A protein has these predicted regions:
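The catalytic "switch" region of P-loop NTPases
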Residues: 1-18, 22-27, 63, 155, ...
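P-loop NTPase nucleotide-binding core
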Residues: 51, 57-167
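Alpha-helical lid/collar subdomain of P-loop NTPases
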Residues: 289, 293, 297-379
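Walker A/P-loop-proximal flanking segment of P-loop NTPase domains
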Residues: 1-70, 77, 420-451
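Charge-biased C-terminal accessory regions appended to nucleic-acid-, cytoskeletal NTPase
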Residues: 6, 358-451
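Conserved Walker B
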Residues: 178-184
Length: 451
């Protein structure tokens, strides 16, 4: 079992070798659009946290550098991970350093000019010249002269920088791929956006911003206030807006097969396991990074919980997967259930609610999956309650089960019968599981949780 996830890589000689989500068609069409763009443009690529944006950007870079593209339309490609490469805290210097690493510039003129500008130089020079004064009309003549000189120096530096950048992009064009912007400090992210918009506005330069728009909007509001129209503000920075499409069910299965090989846990390839763990990405987004973390969490807990062939007793692995999902979706309910303080019917109602999108009235998973999930949750809850309540009596009659199920969930339509039969099967398969053993499993889940 591997504890550290392998970093995604894409190479120009085979850009899609590690494409686990079937995104080749999306990448090639997106890159074709970038190559065909004339003049200057800023393109935003929006996707929720953990949707695979970084992998998409890396495949774009590799495809653009491939001989297939370079032989027909040569283009220079610069990758900039704002989270990892924002070393100086100065977006312009960081960006130019990344560009200079890819483009031959013996005299380092681009870097020298960038240093003169000092990323967002106009605003910084105004603050320096005014001594922090807010009322520009109150400036003295000397300060006004300093202010005028600062503006002239900034404008001259801007023109010089754009001239040098344009020369670098003139022959083949330049595509700058910026990733992980929404993970940066709000002030850095906003300054980088302004830098791109106002200093990289050069013919032949195409900028791609891979972002989580919702998260970046929060960064904007943290600076300008909660009532600020952040989405409208962000749209001003891009000329074209693209949306990363979520993977469908077969593509998710391929992703789990990749995780199975990467982590070294064979049970990740079992349908019941991967379908269950994939629920951490429900109900409102694909959450691939959440799924990856859940897979590592599951493998670690399974290794810590399996002793003397315990997993051969029934479906311990499936139960662990379900508990991890419940913890991810509703931690308070999970903790209450683990402590024997949550009734099994309440636990099932919690699962239904957690898996129901905000815009829907029903869970976003198939009935069969939901029944299995509810049955295991109810069974495990019964065991934890037995450990803390001396007078606890398990439900043995279908009629009693159905009545309590409908009261807790508000759902009938034959569901109670399906869940009750699955609960009986689960209870028989997991008859070896004692309250003490259940406690060690939940302790391992809490200990090795990613967050």
């Amino acid at each position: 079992m591997k504890l550290h996830p392998r970093e995604f890589t894409a190479e120009p000689n085979n850009p899609f070798a590690n494409d686990q989500l079937g995104r080749r068609a999306q990448v090639t069409s997106f890159c074709q659009m970038l190559i065909g763009a004339e003049g200057h443009a800023v393109v935003s690529l929006d996707g929720p946290w953990g949707s695979g944006k970084t992998a998409f950007v890396k495949m774009c870079a590799a495809h653009l550098r491939s001989s297939e593209v370079q032989e027909t339309r040569p283009v220079r490609v610069i990758e900039f991970n704002a989270w990892h490469q924002g070393h100086t805290g100065n977006p312009l210097v960081d960006l130019v350093s990344a560009i200079s690493a890819e483009i031959s510039d013996p005299s380092k003129r681009l870097i020298q000019t960038a240093i003169k500008l000092i990323a967002g130089g106009a605003s910084q020079m105004i603050r320096a010249a005014s001594g922090g004064a807010l009322d520009l009309g109150a400036l003295t003549d000397d300060k006004n002269q300093e202010l005028t000189a600062a503006w002239e120096q900034t404008e001259q530096g801007r023109n010089e920088f754009q001239s040098q950048l344009g020369a670098a992009a003139k022959s083949d064009g330049l595509i700058l791929l910026i990733d992980e912007l929404d993970r940066c400090k709000p002030t850095y992210a906003l300054e980088l956006l302004s830098t791109v918009r106002h200093l990289f506005d050069v013919p032949g330069v195409i900028v791609v911003l891979a972002i989580n728009r919702a998260e970046l909007a929060h960064s904007v509001q943290s600076v300008y206030g909660p009532n600020f129209s952040a989405d409208h503000y962000l749209r001003r920075f891009a000329d074209l807006h693209a949306q990363l499409l979520p993977p469908d069910q077969p593509e998710r299965y391929e992703f789990f097969k990749h995780l199975q090989r990467d982590i070294g846990e064979s049970s990740l390839g079992e349908r019941g396991i991967w379908e269950t763990l994939a629920l951490v990405g429900e109900p409102d987004g694909c959450g691939l990074r959440d799924i990856q973390q859940a897979a590592h969490h599951y493998s670690t807990v399974l290794a810590a919980s399996t002793t003397s062939g315990a997993n051969s007793h029934g479906n311990l692995s499936y139960t662990i997967a379900i508990l991890i999902v419940l913890r991810a979706l509703d931690r308070n309910s999970y903790q209450a259930m683990a402590a024997g303080q949550l009734d099994g019917f309440q636990a099932m109602a919690t699962v239904r609610k957690a898996l129901t999108p905000a815009s829907a009235s029903q869970p976003s998973v198939a009935d069969r999956e939901l029944w299995d999930l509810e049955a295991a949750i109810f069974g495990f809850s019964s065991i934890t309650q037995r450990g803390v309540k001396e007078s606890y009596s398990p439900v043995t009659e279908e009629h009693d089960f159905a009545h309590s199920y409908v009261s807790a969930t508000g759902i009938d339509a034959g569901n109670p019968a399906h869940v009750f039969r699955r609960y009986q099967d689960w209870n028989q398969a997991m008859s070896w599981l004692s309250p003490e053993r259940a406690m060690t499993i939940t302790a391992a889940i809490d200990m090795f949780s990613p967050a």
